[in-house]
Amino acid sequence: QWNSSAHHFSSFNNQWYRRSIEYMQDVVGTTPSKWCAGCHDHAVFFNGRFERPMREQIDTPEAQAGLSCTSCHAIVHVGSTMGQGEFVIEYPPLHDLSASDNPILRGAHDLLINLAPGPHRETFLKPFHRDQGPEFCSTCHKVHLDRPVNDYRWVRGFNEYDNWQASGVSGQGARSFYYPDTPKTCASCHMPLVRSDDPAADDGYVRSHRFPAANTALPFVNRDAVQLQAVQDFLRADQISVDI
């Protein structure tokens, strides 16, 4: 699921994003592009590699990693709903074992997770992932640009969190008085329950990590027919109504 998702292709494995950052760095240098990296390029940025122009490291594993599992699940605190990377992320204490070059240590890590998954769950599934899902998503799905980036002034980028909050489905907006019966979060639509035989699947279901939304271009150029169909089905499922 994740392998096909837009989260996987958030970084320099996305040709449109790659060209945008290459052009930005050609014009204004590497420092302003860090504004984008805090949400798009964790493997590059958090390893201190963004001082070097991305043209020189496009083919590195870090540049091709996208947003991995730990990009979301290693976050330990959400600062606010102001967006623009408003989160605190920590190096997972169990990661040294799972990423070890020693196959015995990696095997021991996997065995321990299956025997006693509690520490793994506590490390990677914080209460806010479930209880404050929209606030968690706002850390990267609410964006602005400011003078250090555009040499102009503060301007709003996209803002999916406030749009959700002001809508009827959130249970927090003025239109919520007539629908729905139960408020919906980001995950209600973008991480629907799907069947799975994963050992962690409650009642045989997990939250989909395809993150279907509006981007049909990525699965099309990636020749990923399954992901493309999932996104098309999502867009055709009466997701939006317009009040006139």
Residue ranges and their predicted role:
Residues 36-40, 190:
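Extended, loop-rich substrate-binding clefts of extracytoplasmic carbohydrate-active enzymes
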Residues 3-27, 51-244:
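Primarily the internal scaffold of c-type cytochrome electron-transfer domains
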Residues 33:
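Aromatic-lined, polymer-binding surfaces characteristic
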Residues 42-49:
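Conserved, well-structured interaction surfaces
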